[in-house]
Amino acid sequence: MKELFLTTALLLVVGIAGGMGLGDVFAQTEKTSPPTMGARDCGGADRGRLAQAQEASLSPAERMAWQEIQERIDRMSHGEEAKDLNAAMHFMADNYTLYTSPDKDSPNGKVINKQQIAVYKKQNLDSLYSTSPETQTDIESLSMKGNIATVTIHQHYVRVIRGGDGSPHEVRTSVRHRETWIYTERGWLQRSVQELERGPILLDGQPYHP
């Protein structure tokens, strides 16, 4: 159970990320929209309010990028919910890299490539019974320079996973990370994820410390 849980916790960092892109116009200035939420508790309605609150500080290109990247985040989320590995990774660039935060097992953090992510994510999906509608992955801030967008993401992930004996267990986790997305012939692709902050892990409603 512990090995399974650690895998699940690791894959949280990857996020069930995605979105859908078009748009050829990019801001040439490097401008960051400040996050408006500290400890995030952002549902569907709050997502709209968050984006609206940021709109005044964003250029038209940044607003378009925000919408398109969020849509791709949502599409990869739906792939995860459907246990479709290809869909869950569809908008990851070939050179995608995940940088995890330091922990007791990895004092300097880990650097994980797309091929390794595919292995971890398959294990995660194989152990997944269901994903709760409470799960939400939202952009909190965005900046652009040329065809590169840097976004801060917060994910609240609620799912039911299979224990070692096949029994179901509810897991609640949250993570905040910085992502870079690059605009290509395929639209926006997720190039890197840097873990910034991990929230508490709850297993069947109780704190869990791996």
Regions found by a protein language model. Name each.
Residues 1-4:
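Positively charged n-region of N-terminal signal peptides that target proteins for export
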Residues 7-8, 25:
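Cleavable N-terminal signal peptides
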Residues 8-19:
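Bacterial N-terminal signal peptides
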Residues 26-94:
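Short, low-complexity N-terminal intrinsically disordered segments enriched in polar/charged residues
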Residues 28, 35-37, 42, 115-167:
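Surface-exposed, charged secondary-structure patches
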Residues 34-55, 163-210:
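Low-complexity, intrinsically disordered terminal/linker segments enriched in charged
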Residues 73, 92-95, 102-103, 143, ...:
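A mature extracytoplasmic/lumenal domain signature
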Residues 97-112, 129:
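A short gly/proline-enriched turn/hairpin at secondary-structure junctions
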